[in-house]
């Protein structure tokens, strides 16, 4: 590409999704080797029209903006490396050490259930609950999305709440002084065997959107194929779920080195995981080379006392089939756990007599 040629990358002010900050850093990094010009527009609708008009070449947006706007005639050229999709607790103490009955604000139903699983004693409130309790409904009504969370941090500092749970990008974007405690994907055995928090799908992605026909090869050095694969698999999972399940299902897909899985399996003495990675045609201890795709999915009942979860590790070339099988297994498990079991006359050798008795369902998704 000649020096006179440049690419105009469109963006919008922060939308609490991390996109604005990431594209700015990406332009700063890759702009050292080619002419990239960042242009900020006031609204996503304006940015989309500017892209269609040909005034810009690329528009950076979140997965939620892509699915929530009219993108006819546009396509996804690729994705930047995925940012951490986990949510965080903004509080003085880790979730394990919050006082009994501490007040924590959380708007997302999945995170509320996951937090109840960990700390059933906490008082979980919504922003509306806090506003009503503090007689501040009028104050909240006049705020936009950029003002809500700084106000919530003020309430925490004043002792009106003990903490609040937000996407990591919200904490980073507002430069909050409060300590950030990651609600992580891995079970933390150092913190009273803390349960993992599988996040709501599609967080942390930055899509580079272009007009159809844009030469993707011209920006290939900016793109992360593993992030694109994870995005497409998480999107497929979300689209296949019943709409009633989407707000209460956590799903996460990531490509990782096989050494990462081996280290995890060794630390947790996970013989099943070790066995699944062994090449049966070679001596034990010699594993198939290459990365793996890890897929996790879970949902909980409202009180957080019962969890339905599945996970699968596959090679990249088998990722779509792996996703289909993961969902099939998850939905079958969910069906069994949410169905009352009728009494049966069938007697299975080795099973206790109570096996034939009627039994209630293991979980209700709406109690």
Model regions: which residues?
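Short beta-strand-centered segments that line the small-molecule binding cleft or hinge
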Residues: 47-88
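Short coil/turn connectors at secondary-structure junctions
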Residues: 72, 98-102, 161
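Short secondary-structure boundary/capping segments
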Residues: 77-81, 95-96, 197-199
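Glycine-rich nucleotide phosphate-binding loop and flanking beta-alpha elements
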Residues: 65-70, 112, 171-172
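Flexible hinge/capping segments at coil-to-helix
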Residues: 89-104, 118, 122
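Small-molecule-sensing regulatory modules
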Residues: 1-54, 113, 117-367
């Amino acid at each position: 590409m000649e020096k006179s040629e440049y690419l105009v990358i469109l963006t919008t002010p922060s939308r609490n999704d991390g996109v604005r900050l990431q594209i700015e850093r990406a332009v700063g990094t890759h702009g050292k080797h080619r002419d990239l010009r960042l242009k900020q527009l006031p609204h996503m609708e304006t940015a989309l029209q500017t892209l269609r008009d040909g005034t810009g070449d690329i528009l950076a947006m979140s997965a939620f903006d892509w699915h929530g706007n009219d993108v006819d005639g546009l396509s996804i050229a690729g994705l930047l490396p995925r940012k951490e999709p986990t949510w965080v607790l903004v509080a003085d103490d880790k979730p394990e050490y919050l006082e009994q009955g501490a007040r924590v604000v959380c708007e997302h139903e999945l995170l509320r259930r996951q937090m109840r699983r960990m700390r059933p004693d906490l008082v979980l409130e919504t922003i509306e609950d806090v506003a009503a309790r503090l007689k501040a409904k009028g104050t909240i009504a006049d705020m936009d999305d950029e003002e809500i969370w700084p106000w919530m941090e003020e309430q925490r500092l004043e002792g009106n709440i003990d903490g609040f749970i937000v996407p990591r990008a919200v904490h980073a974007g507002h430069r909050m002084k409060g300590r950030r405690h990651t609600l992580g994907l891995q079970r933390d055995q150092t913190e009273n065997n803390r349960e993992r928090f599988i996040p709501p799908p599609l967080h942390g992605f930055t899509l580079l959107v272009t007009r159809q026909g844009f030469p993707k090869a011209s920006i290939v050095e900016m793109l992360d194929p593993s992030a694109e694969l994870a995005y497409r698999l998480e999107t497929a999972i979300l689209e296949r779920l019943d709409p009633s399940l989407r707000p209460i299902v956590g799903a996460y897909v990531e490509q990782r080195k096989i050494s990462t899985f081996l280290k995890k399996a060794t630390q947790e003495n996970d013989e099943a995981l070790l066995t699944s990675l062994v090449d049966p045609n070679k001596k034990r201890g010699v594993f198939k080379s290459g990365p793996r795709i890890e897929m996790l999915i879970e949902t909980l009942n409202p009180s957080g006392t019962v969890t339905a979860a599945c996970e699968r590790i596959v090679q990249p070339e088998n990722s779509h089939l792996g996703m289909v099988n993961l969902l099939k297994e998850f939905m079958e498990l969910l069906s069994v756990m949410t169905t009352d079991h009728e009494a049966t006359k069938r007697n299975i050798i080795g099973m206790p007599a109570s096996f034939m008795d009627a039994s209630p369902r293991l979980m209700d998704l709406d109690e």
